[in-house]
């Protein structure tokens, strides 16, 4: 009985320490954030950050003043139907350009008739390669995870060259990419081209980030979320376990005969 009690005390202590290591990114005001690129407005009320879509404005970002490299990010988000949004991470600014924000983005895509992709949780490379690095076409199970006009729980793990996402507990992305290693986190209000979308809103709450003890806090990888490796001349642990190996080292002709 004493042994069981000791175990429970240790587990409770670990949970308390784990909770204490998280940093809440939403305060009483937006003093730790800054507007980037566009002119859409953000406001904070009762712990909820709300961004309002604005016609004739480029995409607008509310970015953290602090930069983050390796971290776990969790938040809840509510996207009104018809809007496209996202959260930038490890992102930077191009100097003296209108489309200044670039870097990785977690897609937040409310279902609309023109797109009908439902790729929320996928990884897009904003204003750089300008492609989906992890499209949910490779992970169809994840396409139904996001709920439009409801609060959704999002989790991002950006640790080393590994980027993984979850939407409402469903793993969406499992990406290996090393293009960006550090940068700000930013909430996006995407540009709109229709008056019917004017004034629609995206809301975020309970945004928190973990920068310590990351490996101990990682979620397990699901088999239905295939790994995509974008790094040249690099094999992941999973690929090595599957038996992949290089037949050309990228430098010499070792192992080849003429």
What does each model-found stretch correspond to?
Residues 1-20:
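Bacterial Sec-dependent N-terminal signal peptides
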Residues 19-258:
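Carbohydrate-interacting regions of secretory-pathway proteins
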